[in-house]
Design a protein with these regions (language model features):
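Zinc-dependent deaminase
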Residues: 1-18, 89-168
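Short beta->alpha transition motifs characteristic of CBS
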Residues: 38-45
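Short cysteine clusters
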Residues: 83-86
Length: 168
């Protein structure tokens, strides 16, 4: 059985490909059911011209027929802490566990999971910090290789600044 680091490493590779190929935010998601990959999603906000084409939503939408009937556990590996929208989608799809690399200090949704206990029948286990440094370095690389003309640049710059401040 592969561990969380294995799947997160795959997600980070996918995020780097999306960044290089499409100038997208370096955020991606891999959906795993009982240690078998059932989907991959990359953030596509630049390509889609919007702000809700998140990797988590993309992979859950693509695998929608499988998520309710697949073997368990169903684990969502994402390179950045999910926002509240993506957390809600994961809960509604019955994800058992969410694993993320880097915290999204300005808008991360993991803190809302505990607030939802008692409201929703099933809340996924949430594990953060898996290969956190690798994702942080990828975010820094995005800032260095892109500029303010990329709409995602400001968000990534804020993520990195707040992350660095949290380390002090």
């Amino acid at each position: 059985m592969r561990d969380d680091s294995f799947w997160m490493r795959e997600a980070i590779k996918l995020a780097e490909e999306g960044m290089k190929e499409y100038s997208e935010l370096p955020i991606s998601t891999i959906l795993v059911a009982n240690d078998k990959e059932i989907g991959r999603g990359v953030t596509a906000n630049v390509r889609e011209g919007g702000v809700i084409a998140h990797g988590e939503l993309n992979v859950l939408l693509a695998a929608k027929r499988q998520v309710f009937s697949c073997e368990r556990p169903l684990v969502l590996y994402t390179t950045l802490e999910p926002c509240i929208m993506c957390l809600g989608a994961a809960i509604e799809c019955g994800v058992d566990k969410i694993v993320y690399a880097m915290p999204a200090l300005p808008d991360g949704g993991a803190c809302y999971a505990d607030r939802m206990r008692g409201i929703k029948e099933k809340i996924p286990e949430i594990v953060g910090g898996v290969l956190e440094t690798e994702e942080y370095l990828l975010m820094k690389k995005f800032i260095e290789t892109h500029n303010e003309t990329n709409p995602a640049w400001y968000y990534v710059n804020q993520l990195v600044r707040e992350y660095e401040a949290s380390l002090k």
